[in-house]
């Protein structure tokens, strides 16, 4: 078999995106402007929500979700131990205390019984993570927060309107995923998306916030609050100041700078037009991988079933019986064949920052067990059928030495 070079997750950029970016550059308007506003509108239609706010990262989106909710010092936020750092660091930025929750056995999802048991009078939010693009069991999550609503102590009008622990979804991987007929974005109370270069849908860097409409809370006012938080607390953005005589603005609060630019939005506008085809191609590749690898006893995620349709972001495999050292050997052998692999994720209690906060991976045995024999294969829309075959054949050959 002729050696190939298979990147892990390159962006899928075509002349459509390049031309739209060039038009944005020629327009003379390159910061937050008409293209950003159009992308927000298009994404809201796609997610079946009233409003979307485009920002410069998913981390900023999650942090602003928590800040809009008024979550801060003295509050607790429940976070899966098995996730990327942004899921937890956004809450820490706000001054809240993170409480990690172990995974279910042989699953990337939180142990929802443990999550429910962890809810106290201080708990304000639970961060759910649709890892790999697969929606969590939101029925169980909402059941848990409803059963514990008597403990909830609202600190402001929006918390009072929701009346229970708030479900804040980290959908960094999950734009386009569906669960029981609902799109990611309209399932959780608040949702953040990532448009980073490695994601299915990219604006190079970037992200977005959206939310379900809340009775008694005005969506336009919420949107305005995000605008203030994302642009120094400035009462007008640059586009609004272009109106005749409209130079003057106020600073409402000493806040943050995390707005999206029209150059980034230009990429996103064309990506969204192409997105149904990109998702379909990912589903094809996952189907081929599943057919080749499951008969060997390799464990994989269930991306598509009667309850949910994944966005197909990650192809996570688990090789039964291998050690961390053997996992590394397999990754190196794949790299020697020209195939880049990865691991998603090293549980946060294993990381220096979180160990320093007192967390110990020994308290999260299911998260560690899932991680220690996990290998993520390349899954992206730049893969040809021949590339997919090359990845499958090499992986089967290498893994057979260890099974």
What are these regions (language model features)?
Residues 21, 25, 65, 391, ...:
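Hydrophobic "lid"/C-terminal helical patch
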Residues 37-41, 49-50, 125-129, 134, ...:
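PLP-dependent aminotransferase class I/II
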Residues 106-203, 209, 213-215:
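Active-site phosphate-binding strand-loop segment of PLP-dependent enzymes
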Residues 1-29, 34, 250-252, 378:
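N-terminal "arm"/small-domain region of PLP-dependent enzymes with the aminotransferase-like
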Residues 97, 166, 340:
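Residue-level detector of anion-binding/catalytic polar loops
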Residues 89-91, 183, 263:
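Hydrophobic/aromatic ligand-binding patch that stacks against planar heteroaromatic rings
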Residues 29-76, 90-92, 100-101, 149-155, ...:
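Phosphate-binding glycine-rich loop
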Residues 65-127:
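Conserved PLP-anchoring active-site segment centered on the Schiff-base-forming lysine
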